[in-house]
Amino acid sequence: YSHMPAVLKEFHRQAPKGRLFLRSMNCYEIRDELLAGSLDIGVFYDCVGGFGRSLTTHALGTYSLALVASPEIRRQYPDFITADQNIPVPFIINEPSCVFRQIFERYLGQKSIALDHTIELWSIPTIKNLVKSDVGISYLPRFSVQAELAEGSLAEIPTELTGTTITAVCGHHKNKWLSPLMQLFLELCTDKIRSEV
């Protein structure tokens, strides 16, 4: 979710004594903890499904994805469209439950494109730094690499996944009582989206 820093800044401005506990988790864990009632609010990508009407969700934005590499790696391996090929470059990405990883690995499987190996990291800034350093490629939400694409430290590699998007949502269990601080957080998240429309 690209607006989280601005939302958190405004939350702390409006509720300076409010205590907000943040945990980094994958989308499936967020969904499961929301369903179990052990998490108050979660921001996650809705493509994980499996929550039916048990969760109340608010759409925060739909984001395109991009296959990125350093300009040098893109020059060496520009073709991720032709099927049945081995590309000797690592895929640098989050853990296996990462939704954009799953989308790209499904694409590779459908195209019978094999990569050298996978490097798993939890930090998108670290992933981007390795990719910029010619270590491998990654498939990430475009908002997370927009600055690097604009400055030329990363280059996009075309795929047939053009138009693929993921939608970020803010959710809570439908039976969960929303405290004033939780309501403020939800309002800030949804107001940020409305201000852009």
Residue spans of the language-model regions?
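A late-sequence structural motif
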Residues: 3, 157-197
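Short beta-strand->loop
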Residues: 56-66, 151-164
